[in-house]
A protein has these predicted regions:
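Hydrophobic helical h-region of N-terminal Sec-dependent signal peptides
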Residues: 9-14
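Serine endopeptidase catalytic core focused on the charge-relay Asp
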Residues: 82-213, 238-239
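Catalytic nucleophile loop of clan PA
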Residues: 225-247, 256
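Bacterial N-terminal signal peptides that target proteins for export
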Residues: 1-8
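Protease-domain processing segments flanking chymotrypsin-fold serine proteases, especially trypsin-like
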Residues: 20-104, 113-135, 140-146, 289-295
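C-terminal cap/linker of serine protease catalytic domains
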Residues: 160-177, 248-295
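Short beta->alpha transition motifs characteristic of CBS
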Residues: 106-111, 197, 229, 245-254
Length: 295
């Protein structure tokens, strides 16, 4: 047992030092390249963002896939969302004190990424003024109300149209049953689950898991797992069904794994609570996470 814990501790130390910027990587595309061409292979030193101060590459946002696809139907955690930037994945559902329902995805799914890298700032939109969000079939589901891409936050909220029937339950895994704000140390591994829509792998491996060697930071988590373009925004839950955060970055890339360039290695997640608290302050709206039984 001591030997196992020592290996975990060493692995965690490597993650802390290298984070999602280790190894060889591809940058996420700029808004222009998101419309089609795959990003070139580059060294991770050209990562286009930082998470917790560690150089990272945001998960690429691919151009919208053919309408009607999707392995997680409806408007719920794990379903496809289409924006002006491209295709991403929805995370958690919230009820606002203003009477609207809101559902999340990643901030870079609407703010895009700068060709020069770095933060893209923070924006909020009044009802009726935000960019339109659509489901996998191209149907409008609402408008973006809030978005931030500013280390260590990468989060956005869609203000759902009152006619949209949304579900709180994550495809395959169920939940979230509550919020997970735990901060286990680096010798306490945590299994994390999400349902994504990675292009090339989403139809085959939409439900995936990763292992984090602890979650000591209240703002972000690094874990050993795999992600692909289109997974951006996926809600991440712990094995007991509680909401941990949002999948946003990749680091070590192995394009030969699977098809469509599955990114295997260190992945990065932003913790949920700090981002929701910031959104509440900016919007002036209280937001309550909607829960569902774990499966």
């Amino acid at each position: 047992m001591l030997a196992i814990r020592t290996v975990i501790a060493i692995s965690a130390a490597v993650i802390a030092l290298l984070g999602c910027g280790s190894g060889t990587g591809r940058d996420a595309p700029s808004d222009a390249s998101a419309a089609g061409s795959p990003a070139p292979t580059q060294s991770a030193s050209s990562a286009n963002w930082t998470l917790g101060g560690v150089p990272c590459a945001l998960i690429p946002v691919p151009a919208a896939a053919p309408l009607g696809i999707g392995t997680c139907p409806g408007v719920r955690p794990g379903a496809i969302v289409l924006s002006d930037v491209g295709q991403c994945t929805l995370n958690f559902l919230f009820l606002g004190s203003d009477g609207y329902s809101y559902i999340g995805t990643a901030g870079h799914c609407i703010l895009g990424t700068s060709p020069f890298g770095g933060d893209a700032g923070e924006m909020a939109w009044d009802p009726g003024t935000g960019p339109v969000a659509r489901d996998a079939g191209g149907n409008p589901i609402g408008e973006f109300a809030y978005a931030i891409l500013q280390d260590p936050k990468d989060f956005s909220l869609i203000r759902l149209d009152p006619s949209v029937q949304a579900s709180a339950g994550m495809c395959h895994f169920g939940g979230p049953t509550a919020v997970n704000d735990d901060n286990p140390g680096i010798t306490e591994p945590v299994v994390l689950n999400w349902f994504g829509n990675g292009v090339g792998v989403g139809a085959v491996l939409p439900a995936r898991s990763a292992v984090a060697a602890g979650m000591p930071s209240p703002d972000h988590v690094f874990a050993q797992g795999a992600a692909a373009p289109g997974d951006s925004g996926s809600g991440v839950i712990s094995s007991d069904g509680r909401a941990v955060g949002v999948l946003v970055t990749v680091g070590v890339h192995t394009a030969s794994v699977g098809s469509g360039g599955l990114d295997a290695g260190m992945i990065g997640m932003t913790r949920l609570t700090p981002q929701v608290e910031r959104a509440k302050a900016v919007l002036g709206v209280d937001l309550v996470l909607q829960v569902a039984p774990a499966q």
